[in-house]
Amino acid sequence: MNNLFFLLGVAAVVVMLFTFDVSFVELWQHLCHAGYWLIPIVGVWILIYGMNALSWQTIIRSKCKEAKVSFWRIYRLTITGYALNYATPVGGLGGEPYRIMELSKDIGNQRATSSVILYAMMHFFAHFWYWFSSIFIYLALAAVGDLPINTAIGTLLGIVIVFCLIAFYIFSKGYRHGLVTKVIRWLGHVPGLRKWSARFQENHAEALHNIDEQIAALYAEDKRAFYRSLLLEYLSRVVQSSEVMFMLLLFGIDCGGGFSGLLITFLHSFLIVSFTTLFANLIGFLPMQLGVQEGGFVLSIAALGLSAALGIFVSIICRVREIIWILIGILLMKIDKK
């Protein structure tokens, strides 16, 4: 099974290399333009994945205090899991089965399943808080005249607020009562899956109940771990904004320079990442979100009054960074040290 995931990752890299929207000559020109800035652009993800791993480790230790899973192992599974998420046909989901399979060797299948589900929930929960907070950042920048505001933009922001509030309600129900059993039951309404759903619930009723209990227990019994994990995931999104800021600075876009100029540039980067990730996650079923991320960057950067060419450059460099980290992830898959 490990080799299957490895081959999937390799195939994904090949596909990504041949699905760039520019020729290899143009790609090389973009890379040359990025120059030494590629080092912090790629390197900042060492910190981002480290924060993700700490968030997941917090959940694992809360669920299984006697478990002796090293931070390096969690860090490795974090990077590899995200590499597979980029690569799989069901974008954003492929890494979870691999994480469960590997972590089961350390803490057992049920605890591994609940911890991976809890971390995936936390990952998306933090996304919604990131999108929610970006609305108020946009409004603050609009209030000082830095960004436009009109009826269309106000309506769009209102829709996002409602979307996030609905998500907060769903997550609160999931964290209080568990959601695995409900998801399996809901799948029974999908044509062709009714018999499978009923059979799965019947054969695994006790395991599903135990996993849901473990999910609900995190918030009910260890709120400190819950909020620490959430904060780490949220802050990792904030740090991710620096990746785009590096590229804006590369083009000399610093909003006048100085502390205030750099702060506004960072907030612009925050909004660019927020819109792009929202756009990509809404259409997350595409493998490697091909074309979606690129479109998100171009639209979000253009909305801030910057050139579409800059949006294309940012999307290409981010795609290169993804390929580099997918390669790192699939290589780490071959490292079995715990």
Residue ranges with predicted function:
Residues 71-73, 106-121, 307-317:
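Membrane-interface alpha-helices at helix entry/exit sites of multi-pass transporters
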Residues 83-90, 271-294:
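Transmembrane alpha-helix interface/packing and boundary motifs in multi-pass membrane proteins
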Residues 52, 56, 88-93, 123-134, ...:
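Alpha-helical transmembrane segments and their lipid-water interface positions
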Residues 201, 284-287, 297-317:
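Hydrophobic alpha-helical transmembrane segments in multi-pass integral membrane proteins
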Residues 75-106, 202-212:
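Extended non-transmembrane interhelical loops and adjacent amphipathic helices
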Residues 92-104, 133, 285-303:
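Re-entrant/interfacial helical elements at transmembrane boundaries that shape
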Residues 131-145, 303:
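Transmembrane alpha-helix termini and helix-breaking/packing motifs in multi-pass membrane transporters
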Residues 1-79, 148-280, 312-314, 321-338:
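Predominantly cytoplasmic-facing regulatory/coupling regions of multi-pass membrane proteins
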